[in-house]
């Protein structure tokens, strides 16, 4: 019976092209079915590990690790940039962030000649404005582009500091190991913006007193205007600019009551942490991981296993838990193809970055070979914004 169910589920989606799956990244990672991973690599201040598992028909999670100069000037400062972009409504916004966020950060770092919270904030703003310009240009012919958005988590290691900026519900968790006891302690550095959090609902209600329905409990899930769970994001322009909440936008996306100021924000919450010797690593992941494990569970897994392949291990544990919740075997879950797989778990992206205390202490002038890695999956062609893409078109584009 279970075998028949697997065959039915696999038949619901078009065949996956292995060439298409591998074409999304040339960063040295490996592909096993819907799982992409880079078991190990080196950044300016230590080691890293990355993994991505796809659940959606088109991968909505995007991610990158950039290490080397954090400025458009070769003189530095030097450091490591990590980005996890969890898209919703399609992959267009997260793909756009992946292509532009780091370049904006380098530009503003060059202008200020240093890394700072203000630099990161400006990079978020410039990325948001860039995507807004695309929506403006395409709205009449592709109105649904206004409904696509992405959470955005950025971590920057530079000059002995760890900057964590977040808009949405991805999460960055610091692993600290106490030298006396050897115990690992999890510290969440990112603030989350999800309507399921009471403080977020209170913030929204205070910002929008004229909208009694600013947060609505719908099917036991709190949502902004009954539509979206996150209160901060890049994109989602139809909930930020009223001129994009009208025809030709589909009626199901249009609000009944007008609004004069943005209902969602793109401004990140930023934390700056001075790295200490007991700070051993940071886990940056989309909410697909955190749905299946706690901060402490994730930190314990990293602490108690080899660094090589640790991101893949975290993803595997999350998938095993997802299978357990559905009373099925992990081996059977892996047989379910993208698209249908989304009924069992979300896209999951995990990047684990380790800190070498000796390297961190040498500061932002530490030079090293430039490193640029992007997570992979079955994706839209580069620089293509096509919300109307059909499965047949997507397969054809990936094969070309």
Curated annotation (Swiss-Prot):
Instruction: Kindly indicate whether the keyword Manganese belongs to this entry.
Output: yes
Its needed co-factors are:
Mg(2+); Mn(2+)
Source species of the chain: Arabidopsis thaliana
**Top enzyme category:** hydrolase
Q: How is the subunit organization of this protein annotated in UniProt? A: Interacts with SAUR19.
Sites of the modification Phosphoserine? 75
| Role | Dephosphorylates and represses plasma membrane H(+)-ATPases (PM H(+)-ATPases, e.g. AHA1 and AHA2), thus influencing negatively plant growth and fitness.
Q: What is its EC number?
A: 3.1.3.16
**Source organism lineage?**
Eukaryota, Viridiplantae, Streptophyta, Embryophyta, Tracheophyta
Q: Which residues form the PPM-type phosphatase domain?
A: 47-355
What phenotype has been reported when the gene encoding this protein is knocked out?
Slight increase in hypocotyl length. Plants missing PP2C42/PP2C-D2, PP2C64/PP2C-D5, PP2C79/PP2C-D7, PP2C63/PP2C-D8 and PP2C68/PP2C-D9 exhibit an increased hypocotyl length, as well as an enhanced sensitivity to LiCl and media acidification.
Picking any one GO molecular function of the record gives: protein serine/threonine phosphatase activity
Q: Where does Mn(2+) 2 bind?
A: 86, 287, 346
Name of the protein this chain belongs to? Probable protein phosphatase 2C 64
- Family annotation (InterPro entries): PP2C, PP2C_BS, PPM-type-like_dom_sf, PPM-type_phosphatase-like_dom
Q: Which UniProt keywords apply?
A: Hydrolase, Magnesium, Manganese, Metal-binding, Phosphoprotein, Protein phosphatase
**Record's Gene3D superfamilies?**
PPM-type phosphatase domain (3.60.40.10)
Residue positions binding Mn(2+) 1:
86-87
Family named by the database record: Belongs to the PP2C family.
Q: Which gene encodes it?
A: PP2C64
User: What does the cofactor field's note say?
Assistant: Binds 2 magnesium or manganese ions per subunit.
Q: Which reaction does it catalyse?
A: O-phospho-L-seryl-[protein] + H2O = L-seryl-[protein] + phosphate; O-phospho-L-threonyl-[protein] + H2O = L-threonyl-[protein] + phosphate
């Amino acid at each position: 019976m279970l075998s028949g169910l697997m065959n039915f589920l696999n038949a619901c989606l078009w065949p996956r092209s292995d060439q298409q799956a591998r074409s999304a990244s040339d960063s040295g990672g490996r592909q096993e079915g819907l799982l992409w991973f880079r078991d190990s690599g080196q950044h300016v201040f230590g080691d890293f590990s990355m993994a991505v598992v796809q659940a959606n028909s088109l991968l909505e999670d995007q991610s990158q690790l950039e290490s080397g100069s954090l400025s458009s000037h070769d003189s530095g400062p030097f450091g490591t940039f990590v980005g996890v972009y969890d898209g919703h409504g399609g992959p267009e916004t997260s793909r756009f962030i992946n292509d532009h966020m780091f370049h904006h950060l380098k530009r503003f770092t060059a202008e200020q000649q240093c890394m700072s919270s203000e630099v990161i904030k400006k990079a978020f703003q410039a990325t948001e404005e860039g995507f807004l310009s695309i929506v403006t240009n395409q709205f009449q012919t592709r109105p649904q582009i206004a409904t696509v958005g992405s959470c955005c988590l950025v971590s920057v290691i530079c000059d002995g500091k760890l900057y964590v900026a977040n808009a949405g519900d991805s999460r960055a968790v610091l692993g600290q190991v106490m030298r006396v006891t050897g115990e690992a302690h999890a510290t969440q550095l990112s603030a989350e913006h999800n309507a399921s959090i009471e403080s977020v609902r209170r913030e929204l209600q205070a910002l929008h007193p004229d909208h009694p329905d600013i947060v609505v409990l719908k099917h036991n899930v709190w949502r902004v205007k009954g539509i979206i769970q996150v209160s901060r994001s890049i994109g989602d322009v139809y909930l930020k600019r009223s001129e994009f909440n009208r025809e030709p936008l589909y009626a199901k996306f249009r609000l009944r009551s007008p609004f004069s100021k943005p209902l969602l924000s793109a401004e990140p919450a930023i934390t700056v942490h001075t790295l200490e010797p007991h700070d051993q690593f940071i886990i940056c992941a989309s909410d697909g991981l955190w749905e299946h494990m706690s901060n402490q569970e994730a930190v314990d897994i990293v602490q108690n296993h080899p660094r090589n392949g640790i991101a893949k291990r975290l993803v595997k544990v999350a998938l095993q838990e997802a299978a357990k919740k559905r009373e099925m075997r992990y081996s059977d879950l892996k047989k379910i193809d993208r698209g249908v797989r989304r009924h069992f778990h979300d896209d999951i992206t995990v990047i684990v970055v380790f800190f070498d205390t000796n390297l961190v202490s040498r500061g932002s002038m530490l030079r090293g070979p430039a490193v640029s890695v992007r997570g992979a999956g079955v994706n839209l062609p580069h620089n293509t914004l096509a919300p109307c893409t059909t499965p047949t078109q997507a397969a054809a584009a990936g094969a070309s």
